[in-house]
Amino acid sequence: MTNCEHFRFLSSDGKTQLHACLCIPDEKIKFRAVLQIAHGVAEHIERYDDFARYLNEQGIVVAGHDHLGHGQSLPEGGTPVYFGEKDGWKHAVDDIHGLHLILSKRYKRLPQLIMGHSMGSFLTRSYLIRYPGEKQAAILMGTGWQPGYMLTGGNLVAKRFFYKNGGASTSNFITELAFGGYNRAFAPNRTGFDWLSADTENVDRYIADPMCGADATVGLFRDMLGGIRFNQKNVNLVKMDPNTPVLFISGQDDPVGAMGKGVQRSCDAFRSAGVKDVTLKLYPGLRHEILNEKAMQNTVYGDIHDWLSRYV
């Protein structure tokens, strides 16, 4: 039986106690590796509980934390979906490393792996650049590639609202600019989050979850655009450890990945940067949250496990 521990550790911002989960396989199962998960925007780490329990049955320890401004890391009276006034992206990436240090100390002899979903995939990409060689394999799920003109334009808009209303503010204009197009691909829409999943029950659970779905702040948009720009620069891409295998895995109908095109572009960029072992897996008919598509869940879980098993 899986044993899940909950604990807190200090964020690199020097003030926030981050909530973390550690799911440990039954002691009768041989431990093979540790997988650290970085979750997406406007959600929380406990949404990955079912996936963690599956991997526990395969002997893989699973851990993750709620990012700054998310889930149970949000302090009372704090601003949801907000990394902070300054250096937010840096803090979020450094927090991933903070948990990595805890895990690598506790499980010294086990391979350390990482998986990032959506915003977590972009944080993971920054992590692979800033902390090369710390992880023995990486999975980038629900990721994409943004054209330079979109990053430049989006950054100008975000900065305008940031200086006008502050980083903790929200903007309907920016939210529509960032996410509105995602849902239009699936019109007529049943909800504002149809783009997440073809599984209506999953979408409804997301909407009903009080720790999901809050509008991202202007500050987080600014931070994320800056992080994506950092990730896509060739001068940074070549800083990654070329020997760290990477799996790009997404739904073919995921608008975050431009219906597969942005995922392929990211995959090509990693190969061009010298990463030796890059795998691409796209699922026809699946949207953004491929772990939560019940019709294909067993297949997706199994494919991820099979890929990890090449290295652990």
Per-region residue spans from a language model:
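N-terminal cap/lid segment of alpha/beta-hydrolase-fold proteins
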Residues: 1-27
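Active-site glycine-rich loops that stabilize anionic/oxyanionic intermediates
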Residues: 32-35, 39-43, 118, 252-253
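Conserved alpha/beta-hydrolase
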Residues: 47-78
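Alpha/beta-hydrolase active-site loop
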Residues: 84-104
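Alpha/beta-hydrolase fold nucleophile elbow
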Residues: 106-118
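Alpha/beta-hydrolase-fold enzymes
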Residues: 124-211
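Short beta-strand/loop motif that positions the catalytic acidic residue
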Residues: 248-250
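Catalytic active-site module of serine/aspartate enzymes centered on a nucleophile-bearing elbow/loop
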Residues: 271-273, 277-312
